[in-house]
Amino acid sequence: MDHLPIFCQLRDRDCLIVGGGDVAERKARLLLDAGARLTVNALAFIPQFTAWADAGMLTLVEGPFDESLLDTCWLAIAATDDDTLNQRVSEAAEARRIFCNVVDAPKAASFIMPSIIDRSPLMVAVSSGGTSPVLARLLREKLESLLPLHLGQVAKYAGQLRGRVKQQFATMSERRRFWEKLFVNDRLAQSLANNDQKAITETTEQLINEPLDHRGEVVLVGAGPGDAGLLTLKGLQQIQQADVVVYDRLVSDDIMNLVRRDADRVFVGKRAGYHCVPQEEINQILLREAQKGKRVVRLKGGDPFIFGRGGEELETLCNAGIPFSVVPGITAASGCSAYSGIPLTHRDYAQSVRLITGHLKTGGELDWENLAAEKQTLVFYMGLNQAATIQQKLIEHGMPGEMPVAIVENGTAVTQRVIDGTLTQLGELAQQMNSPSLIIIGRVVGLRDKLNWFSNH
């Protein structure tokens, strides 16, 4: 270990930055956030430093560097574009046993600045020892995505509860289980973020007083259309916290690779015309796992409330009194159209968009007359097997046969395939494609040749 990671208490302690440019400004923000009593020395300053000085947040010393500026300091940073001056600052600090950071010169510094994830009072620092700052930044970004934005407020609140929790729960095991519940409770985090004291109190009392082996909860998470990069930040956090993940065929392997390693995985994949697991059985799986006290994520392709039968699953949980929440996802219509260069709406071609399922309950019939109207875009989910019928019905109800159409297979994935043509060709085009596919019908499809960006990557 080349460097010892430490967290310094700098509040109301004298610190010095030598340098008045953009790099010095970034360092100054960190020291000000830490409550340091900051002096900045430079020949000239960018406007932000002047604004801070006018607000009484720091002291500016304009002119050449003088070693006496270090006499009362606990910490110094050399952040000029003059290597000789930076070295001089470092040597003067070293002589006074003051830790000094030299920007972009780790070998000349007695300490280095890590990449920081600030969820105060929770702080995470990532460092490559100065060998690869870009790698440290990339790791910080990945960790940022895993830590909820309001986690710091929850951590601070937890500190206020420690005494009561110690009284309420006799053993370390019980306390640990309580804290695990508290830190993953979305309602408490949101209540703290909104400063909703009533909700904070209610949620806290519920968490403290309910049995530790209480019923679990189910989180319905939309996985998006395929590309793992389109999974929402909150969706990622939920699958990282799950005890059980119940998922279907439309969830990509890349997304499943993000699931917590020790979580149980239950595949309930379905295909058009063939159900691996009946819907009622899926409902019972969710219910059964939650009743064991587990945190269950029902992971569904696209958005769970758009042709995902999410509402049916939640009704079962609601009737059984199981707590649940929903994390929406990017629906296939948005993802597939964007990755195919087809805007769903356009001032010249479409003032509305219709999302339509290719599957209806027995006896169901679509309003084909309204669907055949101009100035709109139609998006058919699960319509591949019904493409010939869709073609026939729309033409019968007045849609022009030359209306542009596109079919998107495996939308947003690296294996995405798009085929386009006219409405009179739709049934024939569908025979060339495989599920999962999405059908898009409307004048906006004609923009695809101009706006198709994804196939060029």
UniProtKB/Swiss-Prot annotation:
* Residue sites binding NAD(+) per the record: D22, V23, L43, A44
Q: Where is this region: Precorrin-2 dehydrogenase /sirohydrochlorin ferrochelatase?
A: 1-204
Q: Which PROSITE patterns does this entry report, sorted A to Z?
A: SUMT_1 (PS00839), SUMT_2 (PS00840)
Record keywords, A-Z: Cobalamin biosynthesis, Lyase, Methyltransferase, Multifunctional enzyme, NAD, Oxidoreductase, Phosphoprotein, Porphyrin biosynthesis, S-adenosyl-L-methionine, Transferase
Statement: the UniProt record of this protein carries the keyword Methyltransferase: yes
Which superkingdom does the taxonomy of this entry point to?
Bacteria
Catalytic site: D248, K270
What GO terms in the biological process aspect are recorded for it?
A: cobalamin biosynthetic process; methylation; siroheme biosynthetic process
List the catalysed reactions.
Answer: uroporphyrinogen III + 2 S-adenosyl-L-methionine = precorrin-2 + 2 S-adenosyl-L-homocysteine + H(+); precorrin-2 + NAD(+) = sirohydrochlorin + NADH + 2 H(+); siroheme + 2 H(+) = sirohydrochlorin + Fe(2+)
Q: Where is the signal peptide?
A: none
**Enzyme Commission number, as recorded:** 2.1.1.107, 1.3.1.76, 4.99.1.4
Glycosyltransferase listed as a keyword: no
Q: Which residues carry this modification: Phosphoserine?
A: S128
One Pfam match: CysG_dimeriser
**Protein's pathway:** Cofactor biosynthesis; adenosylcobalamin biosynthesis; precorrin-2 from uroporphyrinogen III: step 1/1; Cofactor biosynthesis; adenosylcobalamin biosynthesis; sirohydrochlorin from precorrin-2: step 1/1; Porphyrin-containing compound metabolism; siroheme biosynthesis; precorrin-2 from uroporphyrinogen III: step 1/1; Porphyrin-containing compound metabolism; siroheme biosynthesis; siroheme from sirohydrochlorin: step 1/1
Residues annotated as binding S-adenosyl-L-methionine are P225, G301, G302, D303, I306, T331, A332, M382, G411
Q: Where is this region: Uroporphyrinogen-III C-methyltransferase?
A: 216-457
Name the job this protein performs: Then it catalyzes the NAD-dependent ring dehydrogenation of precorrin-2 to yield sirohydrochlorin. Finally, it catalyzes the ferrochelation of sirohydrochlorin to yield siroheme.
| Family as reported in the entry's similarity comment | In the N-terminal section; belongs to the precorrin-2 dehydrogenase / sirohydrochlorin ferrochelatase family. In the C-terminal section; belongs to the precorrin methyltransferase family.
Q: What is this protein called?
A: Siroheme synthase
